[in-house]
From Swiss-Prot:
The gene is hscA. This is Chaperone protein HscA homolog. GO terms for biological process: iron-sulfur cluster assembly. It comes from Burkholderia orbicola (strain MC0-3). Chaperone involved in the maturation of iron-sulfur cluster-containing proteins. Has a low intrinsic ATPase activity which is markedly stimulated by HscB. CDD domains: ASKHA_NBD_HSP70_HscA (cd10236). It comes from the Bacteria. Keywords: ATP-binding, Chaperone, Nucleotide-binding. GO terms for molecular function: ATP binding; ATP hydrolysis activity; ATP-dependent protein folding chaperone; unfolded protein binding.
Length: 622
């Protein structure tokens, strides 16, 4: 009888039976799909030989739609029903995109993520992205000749939980099994590292259509370790287009608010061509007629364009400096700078990067394709197609600290920023009041000391805590971040075993706490934050002391003489008078005075408790 053959879990059963998996770069402007063939990653073209799929979806009446090149060609004539740059809307609420520069859409006020009204009904960014992902899936299956087991989809390193979850939802709608969400800079490093057998410290400068990421990676003997990540989730090539768009209108004396939607789209398309032309020419000409009959003829020089976008270029260098500082390295320590994203083709970007790092950036891989290639390599490995030379390890990080709210609106950090993922960390907390039977767990993200200055991610409650005196219960709170960067939180009361948990899927309608700005604020206000934290801690301790004293007096006040009781009341009143003020030293001094003034009272209460416990018991029972 033939023996049954059992392959290693997750591995292809035989070398020739490869499991088909792809890497997808879901971009703001263009999207790509890549796969590993004959041990080499390659971008998969469509039937016309084009590898870039414009991230554009046009909706028609009665459920029809056009995706990619055909939709892009019709964007100027039907702007309200043609959705472009939808990645900028992923995981965002209506309040965050209502003022999106020059967007011709009708945004719908719906719960959660922003919705866009089209001729085919209201659509969410998840649905629009799913159309793009489905098109890439069909392309891959046609090219590879079979169904896919899954895909690695890349996201900006600074995408928050809402944006990552929205991306996974879009993939699910498109019929894709997500093997991993991979940060775009890390994907680029994989492509470069494996292709060139690189080792050392590398910076990945990723300027896409709608986001900017900067990651510092250490490549050593097959280990890809992300040391630090920085970025701006609201800065990309689109912003360079809008800067040029505004300049053209200003030169023509036209107010953008007076333009028809089709003129906005037409002019944006033309200035994008201008921008691309200026990447290889000293000047470029614009000649366009608007629907109003206005005829715009202008010539833009490269120097003019460079001065227009200089503030945007500098915005990319701010998180770059922070990432280097977090990684504790200098520009001179960086062995190479990898450029990612079509926007990095602009000479102003390459010149700025070369000047800052003191070396020309690496450009031997196509910046439009490098992310998809890296994702394909990771997908092939996760699908179980391990071959020789595939013994490498990916260590990614979280961009911002994760913490929990404690009494007084303070933040206790559980997982600090730039921690390698996947990761799990736990910390014990206790109750604040006697008889407390429930605890509210408020999960926050950010670097500041106060909850009000951080981003709220989720809230849940742990109920059923056995009634005990304040401080007796032990609640263990565990934070767990998976390889996709998604967070789960668990709380368990150690004595009773009651527990509660939440998978953090924050509201898609969160206000825009720009992550880069959050980090910048944390550096600028560190001293102020620490003073505020010290004040709140003093106030919380004062409140705890006052409540404990009040409870003790109510229970055992007869243990004090009249003059002793008056002294305790005086000390308590003095503490109460300063407890809500802003003088930390005064609060701490008054708290200490009350603690010292009640020491004798506490000793008498202890004696009373011991006598009560021993009453009526024999010595041999003790």
């Amino acid at each position: 009888m033939a023996l049954l053959q059992i392959s290693e879990p997750g591995m292809a059963p035989a070398p020739h039976q490869r499991r088909l998996a792809v890497g997808i770069d879901l971009g703001t402007t263009n999207s790509l799909v890549a796969a590993v063939r004959n041990s080499v990653p390659e971008v998969l073209p469509d039937e016309a030989g084009r590898v870039l799929l414009p991230s554009v979806v046009r909706y028609l009446e009665k459920g029809g739609r056009r995706i990619g090149h055909e939709a892009k060609e019709q964007a100027a004539t039907d702007p309200r029903n043609t959705i472009v740059s939808v990645k900028r809307f992923m995981g965002r609420g209506k309040a965050e995109v209502e003022g999106a520069a020059n967007a011709p859409y009708e945004f719908v006020d719906a719960p959660g993520m922003v919705q866009i009204r089209t001729i085919d009904g209201v659509k969410s960014p998840v649905e629009v992205s799913a159309e793009i992902l489905a098109t890439l899936r069909y392309r891959a299956e046609d090219s590879l000749g079979d169904e896919l087991v899954g895909a690695v989809i890349t996201v900006p390193a600074y995408f928050d939980d809402a944006q990552r979850q929205a991306t996974k939802d879009a993939a699910r709608l498109a019929g894709l099994n997500v093997l991993r969400l991979l940060n775009e800079p890390t994907a680029a490093a994989i492509a470069y590292g494996l292709d060139n057998a690189a080792e050392g410290l590398y910076a990945v400068y990723d300027l896409g259509g709608g986001t900017f990421d900067l990651s510092i990676l250490k490549l050593t003997k097959g280990v890809f370790e992300v040391l630090a990540a920085g970025g701006d989730s609201a800065l990309g090539g689109d912003d360079f287009d809008h800067a040029l768009f505004g300049h053209v209108l200003a030169q023509a004396g036209i107010d953008a608010k007076t333009l028809a939607p089709e003129d906005v789209r037409l002019l944006l398309d033309r200035v994008r061509v201008l921008k691309e032309t200026l990447s290889s020419a000293p000047e470029a000409a614009l000649d366009v007629t608007l629907s109003s009959g206005a005829h715009l003829v202008q010539t833009i020089s490269h120097d003019t364009f460079a001065s227009l976008v200089e503030p945007l270029v500098q915005r990319t260098l701010t998180p770059t400096r922070k990432a280097l500082r977090d990684a504790q390295v200098t520009p001179a320590d960086i062995k190479g700078v990898v450029l990612v994203g079509g926007a990095t083709r602009m000479p102003v970007i390459r010149d700025a990067v070369a000047k800052y790092f003191g070396q020309p950036p690496l450009v031997n891989l196509d910046p439009d394709q490098v992310v998809a290639l890296g994702a394909a390599i990771q997908a092939d490995l996760l699908a179980g197609n391990r071959g020789t030379g595939d013994d490498w390890l990916l260590l990614d990080v979280i961009p911002l600290s994760l913490g929990v709210e404690t009494m007084g609106g303070l933040v206790e950090k559980i997982i600090p920023r730039n921690s390698t993922i996947p990761i799990a960390r736990a910390q014990e907390f206790t109750t604040f009041k006697d008889g407390q039977t429930a605890m509210a767990i408020h999960v926050v993200q950010g670097e500041r000391e106060l909850v009000a200055d951080c981003r709220s991610l989720a809230r849940f409650e742990l109920r059923g805590i056995p009634p005990m005196t304040a401080g007796a219960a032990r609640i263990r709170v565990t934070y767990q971040v998976d390889a996709d960067g998604l967070l789960s939180v668990f709380a368990r009361e150690q004595l009773s075993g009651v527990e509660a948990s939440v998978v953090v899927k924050p509201s898609y309608g969160l206000a825009d706490d720009d992550i880069a700005k959050m980090l910048e604020d944390s550096f600028k206000t560190a001293e102020i934050d620490m003073r505020a934290r010290a004040l709140r801690e003093a106030q919380v301790e004062a409140e705890r002391m006052l409540e404990a004293t009040q409870a003790a007096l109510a229970a055992d006040g007869e243990l004090l003489e009249a003059d002793e009781r008056a002294q305790v009341d005086t000390l308590a009143a003095a503490l109460r008078a300063v407890a809500q003020g802003d003088d930390t030293n005064a609060i701490e001094a008054a708290t200490k005075a009350l603690a010292d003034g009640t020491d004798e009272f506490a000793a008498r209460r202890m004696d009373k408790s011991i006598k009560r416990a021993l009453s009526g018991r024999r010595l041999d029972e003790i």
